[in-house]
Design a protein with these regions (language model features):
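Short clusters of hydrophobic/aromatic residues that line enzyme substrate/ligand-binding pockets
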Residues: 69-71, 157, 223
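N-proximal helix/coil linker or "cap" segments that precede and/or mark the start of modular domains
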Residues: 33-60
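A generic local structural motif
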Residues: 65-68, 100-101, 193-194
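Short gly/ser/thr-rich secondary-structure transition/capping motifs
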Residues: 60-66, 187-190
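Conserved strand-loop elements at the edges of beta-sheets that form or border functional pockets
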Residues: 73, 82, 225
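Structural alpha/beta surface segment adjacent to cysteine/selenocysteine redox centers
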Residues: 76, 81-167, 238-239, 246-247
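A short beta-strand-turn-helix
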Residues: 62-78, 106
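C-terminal cap of thioredoxin/glutaredoxin-like
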Residues: 2-35, 164-249
Length: 249
């Protein structure tokens, strides 16, 4: 009896040790993931502190035939394509300090067409859902006011905020609810991520800035980070003054 009791205790101890080892292994994996994410955040933070310029190849149909969220005149000679994340504090800082001036001095004056695309980062767990909600608002002509609400409440991102914001914007709630579950809308967000990644984008906010000709964005400049209005204005004014010429000509 004593031997069976001893064996049972040993078996239980071995099971508990095995479970503990498994938990430790899982914790190590999670710590490795967190470590990688922290490194990414650090790199993005550094990127956002200094202007980075890179010239890309000409982008065809950069505005999705007008189907993407946009502001400004369709005939504007310059364009900015934004890649943003609704949980990104640097994106919020850009909107608060730079975007409003760009809108007043370039977009509203017909000089620049502004296109918004999504680039939710993997470690921002609510960012992709927020991007879907914004795109669903776009279907009902309320993208920009929804975008403003999402950025102003980035700590409360989630279904409750999306629903209350949609109600405040007087959206068709049935249509909005169906859209939130539409795989095609999520696929559009994923396509933006794939497209941005193909351009070398890895952090937010990031921007393509270039001249427009025949529906193409000619050799755009890739600008990374929450840069000042002065940085954007310098790039735009330089492009406006330069003759139209593609790389290699």
């Amino acid at each position: 009896v004593k031997q069976r009791h001893k064996t049972a205790i040993q078996s239980k101890v071995e099971q508990e040790l095995s479970a503990l080892k498994q938990e430790v292994s899982e914790l190590k994996k999670q710590l490795a993931i967190i470590g990688s994410q922290v490194k990414d955040i650090h790199n993005i933070a550094l990127d956002s502190q200094r202007p980075q310029h890179k010239t890309l190849t000409t982008q065809e149909n950069f505005d999705g035939d007008g189907a993407l969220a946009n502001l400004g005149e369709a005939t504007a000679g310059l364009a900015i394509v934004e890649f943003s994340d609704y949980q990104c504090p640097y994106c919020k800082r850009y909107i608060d300090t730079t975007f409003t001036k760009l809108k007043t001095n370039f977009i509203d004056k017909g000089k620049v067409k502004y296109i918004a695309r999504d680039f939710p980062l993997a470690f921002h767990k609510q960012a992709k859902g927020a991007a879907v909600a914004a795109n669903c608002s776009l279907q009902q002509g309320a993208y920009w006011p929804m975008r403003e609400r999402l950025f102003n409440n980035m700590r409360q991102l989630g279904d409750e905020l999306y629903q209350s914001s949609a109600e405040q914007l007087s959206l068709d709630m049935d249509q909005f609810a169906k859209c939130l579950e539409d795989e095609k809308v999520l696929a559009k967000v994923e396509q933006d991520i794939t497209y941005g990644s193909s351009l070398g984008i890895r952090g937010t906010p990031s921007f393509l800035i270039g001249k427009v000709e025949d529906g193409r964005l000619l050799n755009p400049t890739l600008l990374v980070g929450a840069q000042s209005y002065e940085t954007f204005a310098a790039v735009l004014n330089e492009l406006a003054a330069a003759p139209v010429q593609e790389a290699g000509e």
